[in-house]
């Protein structure tokens, strides 16, 4: 699917030099209502001119500018007359390219640091406190600014923590303004975007919907489109947007593998088919999946079986649809970034629709490929999807198969479903559902001795996993109030048969992962 026309939106582009925060910079700019894209550092000045951005941000990165394979930038970009903000490595690269000096720091700075703003009237710091806490992560530093630059701020270990050439509108910060640990970082980014670049906040979801609908209609014409529905947010929003654009030309195939949460299959059908009129074919493949998974305990084998079987079921149904020329996917902008290449003609190799046979010739259509996850949720609500569906918990592709440790049985799935439903209900009752990144129940496969009534029991223990996070890359266990945990525990052992013990996982990520398998 061709990109929608974004020529009417003001844009700020972010050049990728390998920082773990690259996507975060792009998201921050979009949060201001300004369209932003993450582009490779190899982009040429001519290519930048065609994009016509209001500003450019050089991201951070793990390299030194003096490394043999240091990531570089086209020097002609500095001659375009476009404002530039360098962050961390981006500041050092700007310094080196423009004639300043970068040296190895005598003492590296990692973590919180205090800076003192020396030029309070600079557009980057105007109206902000002169002393600020920022987040540093660097082993090199600028020791001499290029000609025409002035020092804007300094820290104890970094005399040049920020600099600028106001005439050319080149600005730089050694700290990571994009992370929340920098207390005024977002204000600095906002000042660069609006005050320095003069960008307008004209990136709206309503405009995106209109442009997407027009683009889909133009590309699809009278052809039919098929889409695999997993029950998750991305595929549900994709289905809703496509339905708005082409109506009955879309057929969504919902493979019900029997591994979803309690009532989830029915909720998806109610929201999309009954609520919005999306044409969905529901395939009951529970027995087929359970038969293939019988006796399997290795988590990777479980994943592969589920992925392969999903594709086979999807293929069988797809062949029944006449005149289908397009295959739709819920690819997000994060997928595009992580692939490192243009994926417009590549089918994602995940369990939903990956691995299609070569004789099934489809053109790929990815209406969400320019959106981040949080933007997809906003889009879903704009399109009329229920709030609970749009904001539902992240859920792994293999479903409950990787929350049941070891062999999967109907009995174990029932235990996890029922216990998880109680957890979700009580978290919602306590008003905690949007302050916890992810929460679920897993069945670790252990039994323990207990006493219920006057008798001894030897039943399963279930484990509650609840974490707080910003992006899922790192996570801390959620500090759920004890009275809420107690209520959840009491309900589970009383209402879920064959459970006599409830455990709470207090491990962070790292060293643990969020899921168990």
Curated annotation (Swiss-Prot):
It is an enzyme of class 6 (ligase). Gene3D superfamilies: 3.30.300.10, 3.40.50.880, HUPs. The keyword ATP-binding applies. GO terms for cellular component: cytosol. GO terms for molecular function: ATP binding; GMP synthase activity. It catalyses: XMP + L-glutamine + ATP + H2O = GMP + L-glutamate + AMP + diphosphate + 2 H(+). Keywords: ATP-binding, Glutamine amidotransferase, GMP biosynthesis, Ligase, Nucleotide-binding, Purine biosynthesis. Pfam families: GATase, GMP_synt_C, NAD_synthase. The active site is at residues 88, 176, 178. Residues 203-392 form the GMPS ATP-PPase domain. Its EC number is 6.3.5.2. It comes from the Bacteria. Pathway: Purine metabolism; GMP biosynthesis; GMP from XMP (L-Gln route): step 1/1. CDD domains: GATase1_GMP_Synthase (cd01742), GMP_synthase_C (cd01997). Residues 11-202 form the Glutamine amidotransferase type-1 domain. ATP binds at residues 230-236. Transmembrane segments: none annotated. Homodimer. PANTHER family: GMP SYNTHASE [GLUTAMINE-HYDROLYZING] (PTHR11922:SF2), GMP SYNTHASE-RELATED (PTHR11922). This is GMP synthase [glutamine-hydrolyzing].
